């Protein structure tokens, strides 16, 4: 399976095709939130997305399933920058080179990524 992140730490692709499939975006959101909970020690991280569309919503569902909250157009612990065109470009800030390696380790590791259930699932705010 090809790498998800470019050497600049971005995710690029056509929505619906790898790496921007619904399943993969869900897993990226899950891993991103898990990284912030475990590594940054933020109990309920917040992801800020610029708008709602297939890409941002698939990512958001994974992020919320890990226990984080998602805001549209407001501040958060993590901010998603989205460049649309024939190829979509997703950039997360702040995200260091080390963070990217940790994310890929979570995504491609043998252990399942932890998921929250019930009331522990995060929220979505417009």
Swiss-Prot record:
Protein name: Uncharacterized protein aq_1627
SS bond partners: none
């Amino acid at each position: 399976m090809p790498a998800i992140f470019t050497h600049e730490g971005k995710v690029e692709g056509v929505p619906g095709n790898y790496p921007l499939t619904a399943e993969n975006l869900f897993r990226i959101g899950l891993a991103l939130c898990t990284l912030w909970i475990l590594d940054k020690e933020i109990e309920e991280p917040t992801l800020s997305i610029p708008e709602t569309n297939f890409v941002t919503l698939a990512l958001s569902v994974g992020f919320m399933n890990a226990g984080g909250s998602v805001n549209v157009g407001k501040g958060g612990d993590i901010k998603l920058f989205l460049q649309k065109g024939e190829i979509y470009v997703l950039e997360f800030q702040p995200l260091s080179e080390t963070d990217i390696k940790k994310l890929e380790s979570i995504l491609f590791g043998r252990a399942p990524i932890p998921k929250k259930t019930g009331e522990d699932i995060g929220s979505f705010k417009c």
